[in-house]
Structure formats: C-alpha cells, structure tokens
Amino acid sequence: MGNTADVTVIGDPSLLGVARVRLEQLEQRWSRFISSSDICALNQSKGVAISVHPDTITLVRYLVDAQRLTNRLFDPTLLPSLVQLGYARSITNASLVTQLDGSLQWGKPLAATSIDIANSTVTLPIGLTLDPGGLGKGLAADMVASELRELGAEGVCISIGGDIRCAGIGPIDGAWSIPVASPFIASEVLATATLLDGAIATSSLDAKTWLVDNKAMHHVLSPKTGLPLQRSAEQIIQATVIGAEAVWAEVFATVVLVAGVVEGFTQIEAAGLAALAVFTDGRRLESSHWKEYTE
C-alpha cells in the first residue's frame, strides 16, 4: 500500500509478529504496485470476473460504498490519471511499478461492480480500475486491530501512513494519546487527540509528492478534473478526521481536502465525525465535535 506501519500492543509480545504477518498479507493482496495482487488482477480484468481473497471482497465493498456515500468526492477510480501524472512507482520500493492499459477510464461510478461473496469473485465495469489508496490503509488498521483484540491483546494501536486505529486499553489512564502534527513544521503539534476506542486519520497534499519537468505534483486529485488539487489561500492543505473506524476517518479526510470546508464539513457533521482543517495560509477550522476529543 506504499506506506510504513507502526504497531503497539499491550499484551502478549508475540502478537506483534502476528500483526506483521497479517499486514504483509494485506499488502500482497491489495497493493497496486505488486503484479500478483488481487488489485492488479482486477485492474487488468477487462470486465471478466476475478477470483479474489475474502479480504479483497471486503475491501472492494468499502471502495464501492465510499464512492457512493460521498457522492464520488472520494473516488477510487482515479488511478489511470495518477499514473499518467507520474505516480506509477512505489515510494517505499522503487522496483515496484504500477502497470496499466492505456485505454482505461476514470471518474465513473462503481455501482455496476458485481461482488459475488459466495464464490469470492469481483467483476469490475469494463475500463475501470481500483486504487485502494488511503481507504486500504485505514481498513487494514481496523481489521488488524480487531483481530489482535480477538487474540487477547488488552490494547492495540496501529498506524499506517497517517491512519490510526486504537482499540482496548491505552497506556495513558486507559486511553490513547495521538498528536496531530502541523503540515508546515513536523515537530509542531497542532492538537492532541485522546481516544478510548476509535480512529484518527490525516490526509495532506504533502504526504506523497514528486517532480515532473521540475513541477511539484501530489497525490490528492480532483475527482472532476483528475488533476492534483491546486494550492491557494482557500485550499485546505491538511485534513484530520476522528471517528469510530480508520477506514471512514480516512475517506472523509479526503472528502474535506477535495470538497473544501462547506461541503466537506457538511458531510463530516452528517456522519457524526470530528475534523480539523488546515489551510495553505495557516488558518485552521474545527468542526463542532473536534473539541470533544482534543486538547
């Protein structure tokens, strides 16, 4: 999934090894950079049903639901545009490169995706691809945290590329303390979230960047244009969302970046989440529930 992971377990230390193996399994199934992954098979399927692992069935269901529930403000079909813009190679392993057919489309609804749970197959609409992106990170954190708790961990905190899921007893009076860093100065803490059992995800225009003809590019694309969001005084550069699950915190952090404060915070409030938006010019805006979790 093109990110690093940090895992904290309160309980049997051997569960750290379990978490590592499980995250590696999800990486092998979900990465767009690994040619043998389920995602790569789906992205080359051309409308044919593909047998995938049940983990991938779960992932695809979330991707389809996220696109629908956010009115396509979160759009996992933008991979062809992202690759064309120069983000084909993995940032964590430069030997891994996304390979796509040049005739693929983006920005189309996934509603026609066929998911056969009984036979564990997925059929994507012809011409569309999937990029698990941030949703995959959040879902992986949720799944592994839940599984470690079922295996006896008293408390778990899993962080994958800025998506964090905390479950069970934390080290600070039973809670988990999560700092939110400034997008401008990494050592500066904007807020500290206190979570008993929940998730926090941060999405930023600076999380993944690269150069094309000496022009800086980033990975957060407009679902309308397929191009990186433009930096301006009114543009949000970083969005942090707190909720029950990392998967949805990540989805709606992306929504805030893409849609802006008016539409983004409307969706945040409707979903019962909390958010902090930081603008390019340094201004900050909190949603109504933000102070309930932070100091």
Task: Describe each PLM feature range.
Residues 1-295:
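Mature catalytic core of soluble alpha/beta enzymes
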